[in-house]
Amino acid sequence: MNIRIGHGFDVHKFGGELPLILGGVEVPYDTGLVAHSDGDVVLHAISDAILGAMALGDIGKHFPDTDPDFKGADSRVLLRHCYQLALDKGYRLGNLDVTIIAQAPKMLPHIQAIRECLSADLESDIEAINVKATTTEKLGFTGRKEGIAVEAVVLMCAAPR
């Protein structure tokens, strides 16, 4: 098969003293996200999508939150590792579509910087990377500003040999 599709989803609640990092970009906000790593919920969802497309499990399998080696880990390093696994299997990113679900903070001012960061980490043309944000109209935990959820879908294409 020459193409594979992967879907990733992740959620983190607000809290703690870490800065809010989304898609590799520090986003000004009152608080960060609670997590074993740096809490970059965007990169976690993308990593899961890549691993899913390659039938390699999920980030919990590769970077368990019970392993002290990953305490405070830079999620960009984790993402690049997951992408390298795909490259090792002969696949490259075809395109990526990310949806950030959050009532706050407003994401529009940060979308382009996130796309640029993802383009660099995934060694891909920025035109193959889409990031968008939505709210839940004040419904549910994201609507109550308790946390952020992210969905990511990747299309991975066999790289020419």
Swiss-Prot record:
GO MF annotation terms: 2-C-methyl-D-erythritol 2,4-cyclodiphosphate synthase activity; metal ion binding
Binding site for a divalent metal cation: D10, H12, H44
Top-level division of the source organism's lineage: Bacteria
Keyword Metal-binding found: yes
Gene3D superfamilies: 2-C-methyl-D-erythritol 2,4-cyclodiphosphate synthase
GO BP: any one term: isopentenyl diphosphate biosynthetic process, methylerythritol 4-phosphate pathway
Keywords of the record: Isoprene biosynthesis, Lyase, Metal-binding
EC number from the UniProt entry: 4.6.1.12
Recorded catalytic activity of this chain's protein: 4-CDP-2-C-methyl-D-erythritol 2-phosphate = 2-C-methyl-D-erythritol 2,4-cyclic diphosphate + CMP
Swiss-Prot/TrEMBL cofactor(s): a divalent metal cation
Residue sites binding 4-CDP-2-C-methyl-D-erythritol 2-phosphate per the record: 10-12, 36-37, 58-60, 63-67, 102-108, 134-137, 141, 144
Transmembrane segments: none
Site feature (Transition state stabilizer) residues: H36, T135
Cofactor remark: Binds 1 divalent metal cation per subunit.
HAMAP family: IspF
Subunit-structure text: Homotrimer.
Family: Belongs to the IspF family.
Role according to the record: Involved in the biosynthesis of isopentenyl diphosphate (IPP) and dimethylallyl diphosphate (DMAPP), two major building blocks of isoprenoid compounds. Catalyzes the conversion of 4-diphosphocytidyl-2-C-methyl-D-erythritol 2-phosphate (CDP-ME2P) to 2-C-methyl-D-erythritol 2,4-cyclodiphosphate (ME-CPP) with a corresponding release of cytidine 5-monophosphate (CMP).
Protein name per Swiss-Prot or TrEMBL: 2-C-methyl-D-erythritol 2,4-cyclodiphosphate synthase
Organism: Shewanella loihica (strain ATCC BAA-1088 / PV-4)
